[in-house]
Amino acid sequence: MMKKILQHLQFTINLLYGFNEIAFHLNPRLDQNYIARNTYLNGVWGDEEGFGLMKSPLLSGKGFQIMVFVSQDAYLVCVNGCHMFSFSHRVPPEKVEKIEIFGDIDLKAASLISSEVYPDSSIIKHKKNHETLHLPFFYNLEEDVKPGFKIEIKGKIKLLPVSFRVNLQSSEHVFPHPLIPYHLNVRYAPECYVVQNSWGFTGNNWDEEIRSPLPLSWSPGKDCEIDIYIYDSYILVKGEDWSLPVFKLRLDMDSVKYIYIQGDLTMTFFKITSFRRDEWDDIAAEQLK
């Protein structure tokens, strides 16, 4: 869908069935840098899901493209070729009969197409490495991930965060699901904790989570530093005076081609470098006993 936003505040895309039942309601609110998602069933709005944007790709007077991809489990939404969020099906998608678009936009085109991948590779617009630190952030690795690699990330946690994540994954696509040898997910709501996991070791699903308490330096509103150390058979994540539990690798790191960062973090620095195995080897060795 190609559209141009007029000088106003919001617009709506609805996927409808029956007598004005809304299986998926997408409502970008430009004045709030916020995109609402919901359903409207039997005359009642469901629980709203929201997505806040530090820098919105939807700007007054500027053209843009939205893609809504229907997967087995959810609607996947990208803007200008960049995946933004998903919305789990509350109504079987095959019930949808029509699309409704209205609000403060100048609609240029709308189409229904079939695709085997999402986002569509022909419209993916990842910047070259280091051109931008805006989230969602993709880094296309130019060589295989090897023991001795260190990933340095610096930024500031948003004041009212829900979560942010860092994936070391096999492809740039959201669908089909990439292999993810390492997944770091920092969660703030409804509970605060850190998850380390992988996707694809036990089949087409998430594997067993390793949970740990949230480091104080990753508290809402604080500047944070994330250092990820790659070893032969495990990964170690640490800050200035703490470390997460060692994550034993379940999948071959040779499959990692991209680093993906998304969520409630304003990133200010990203770098891949190497490290010498010194005192952090001692920490890992102690945990692995």
Located regions from the model:
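Peripheral membrane interaction modules
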Residues: 1-65, 69, 73-78, 82-225, ...
